[in-house]
Amino acid sequence: RGLGDVYKRQISYCAVCDGAFFKSKTVAAVGGGSSALQSARLLAELCKKVYVIHRRNEFRGEQRLCEELKSFHNIEFLLNSEIKKINGKTRLESVLVKNNLSGEETVLPLDGLFVAIGKEPQNEIFAEVTELDENGYIKANESCKTSTDGIYAAGDCRTKAFRQLTTAA
């Protein structure tokens, strides 16, 4: 087994799918949008410790989620921070996190890493023909019908609870 194969089991893009594998462990959720915040929320109920790492000084995700996460004793926010290195010989052992303001670097021991970045919809071109929600997703019901007759939206470009390959198909 190569190092990449080992990391594949410890680096996830889906907290719903893989969160239970990290019960009572220390993990990090990376990102600043609603997907990252939802991941952190779910992980906080399962894991001993959850770091939320975001490169900016504030989250772009739903404000309601931000406030809710502050009530969890096992969540620690690392704002203005980025992961610079993933460490481990045969498994994920830690990450090197750099604070972009102070330049300070910290090694965080981790059992799992959940990546939730780069999930911003690119739907602006549809704004003139159908309705978008406050986050830029196309408003559509479970039948994929939009507010405009004859226009349907399928996949992760539309408003929905989960964004995964299996639910986008």
Language-model segments: residues:
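Generic hydrophobic/aromatic pocket-lining and core-packing "Φ" positions
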Residues: A40-R41
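FAD-site-proximal beta/loop scaffold in flavoenzymes
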Residues: K8-F21, I117-T167
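Active-site acidic short loop of glycosyltransferases
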Residues: S24, L110-D111, T148
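N-terminal Rossmann-fold NAD(P) dinucleotide-binding loop
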Residues: A36
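Beta1/beta-strand and adjacent pyrophosphate-binding region of the FAD-binding site
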Residues: T26-A29
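Short, small-residue-biased leader/transition segments that mark boundaries at the very start
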Residues: G2-Y7
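A Rossmann-like FAD-binding core segment of flavoenzymes
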Residues: E45-N141
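Glycine-rich Rossmann-fold phosphate-binding loop(s) that bind the pyrophosphate
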Residues: G31-G33
